[in-house]
Amino acid sequence: MKLYERLMTIDRRIIYGILLGVVTLPLIFPSVVKVTPMSPVEKLFTAVDNTTNDKALILDCSYSPQIKAEVEPMAIAVLRHAFKTRKKILVLSLYVEMIGLATRAINQVVEEFNSNAQTYEDSLIYGRDYVFLGWQPPPIVPMLGMGESISNIYVVDYYGNQTDTLQMMERIRNYNDISILVALSGSRIPISWVAYAQNRYGLAVGVGCTAVSGADFYPYYQTGQFTGLMVGMKGAAEYEELVEANYGVKGRRVASEAMLSLTYAHLAIILFIVIGNIGFFLHRRRK
């Protein structure tokens, strides 16, 4: 078999084997890839950073298990940022199947911080520093209703506590007391937040989404309807980089570790495309 024929007929098992290797090896032996944060992520980071002591931020963890790998690192990065800078944060999910993932992210970050806390003041205390509102159907009800009264929509929190008795909620009544809402989703939920919460109440909306949703959301960012935007694993890695670079928050950076696998996989695919094209042009020249 001639060279160009070999280049054009590489066994698919070889291709899949190489791809399997370049994807799995960096995950087995993880290392962090430093990324340069882009403007959409920097603006979201700044908006969260600018939350004042008299206001809170809302984190909407409305992502499903199918997109957990992409979006959960965003939730963890935002929570680390908020807790490190002592921002008040309300967490919610718009659908019941996403409650477990939101709980997992909160518990992980709270345990990280409290394991290093020296005093009660240093610790993250439920009801004082953060509140998990849980789930209230249908989605349009909390989107519109929280503009008037959060405690009227979420009478009790996820754990059954009366919302209006929690220390943090004494000052946080409606969207006037919220600096920004960060919506993490792989669907069109962030657009609904714009339609119902931003257009009516002027609430700032930031977004974290999957890579395939990015093209749908960039126009909203470009028009200023989205304050900031994290897209896919790269967006999560950029936010992780900002949190560590600005505040020295140490913790496993899952998105930054995954970027190495993505980079190697893309390079391998490009290499195979180049090899196939070289074989094609050699074959055509022989003719």
Positions of predicted regions on the chain:
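Short extracytoplasmic
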Residues: F45-P73
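Membrane-embedded segments
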Residues: Q66-V131
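Juxtamembrane interface at the cytosolic side of transmembrane helices
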Residues: L7-M8, I273-K287
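N-terminal membrane topogenic signal
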Residues: E5-I15, S261
